[in-house]
Amino acid sequence: MDLTKFLGQDSQEQSAQRLSKEEYAAQKKQEREEIWGMIDGKAQEVFQNGDSLKGFLDFMGQCKPQRTDNLFLLYAQNPEIRQVKTFEKWKEEGKVVKTGSKGYNFIVGQEYEKDGVIQQGYSIQKAYDISQIRTKQPEEAEPKPMDQLMEALLTDSEVRIQIADNLPDKVQAQYIPNKRTIYVRNGMSENATFHSISRELACASLDHHDGSYSRAGVSAQAYCAAYV
């Protein structure tokens, strides 16, 4: 029985207090090495081929926003995870973890002071998916009409989006950095239009306006961002 679902981190901290300082440090060091080994292993697996990358991007789309290392860590433990929070965070929301639920390893950022300076660190804690919580489970969102999606995509765009009839063959849309404009072919299917504009908006967001922009350099990130 995992008592952390009833007692949170308190029992773990009390257990740690029974270890010597050296034993506790060694235990935590081993824990961190195992966690980062899991993250590195999953990252290498994800980028092996297109299918494995697609699976990870699908996971990113279903999972509530997380830092990248947590995404790899959670994906390695259960690709069905949708929304995770620590025991304490669920408790703050008045939610209860289901009996028998096993927590997932989870990286939690935290601040600490060293030599009078605030530093950024992290700890390894247990987190629980919403499927493990006694609450009404979220329903899958109904697909929105394409017109509504397109309007949301184009609203408040930081770059101009303009129809162009002279794009090269097989080019659906293209971001031109020195003009801060996305040129898009008219008359494509709804899906092709939406995804091509999404991709070029992602390219534009990766342009730092310092002359370093390279289409080849941002393509992979842009395609992934647009897919998600």
Where do the protein language model's features map onto the residues?
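N-terminal accessory/interface modules of nucleic-acid-binding and processing proteins
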Residues: 1-228
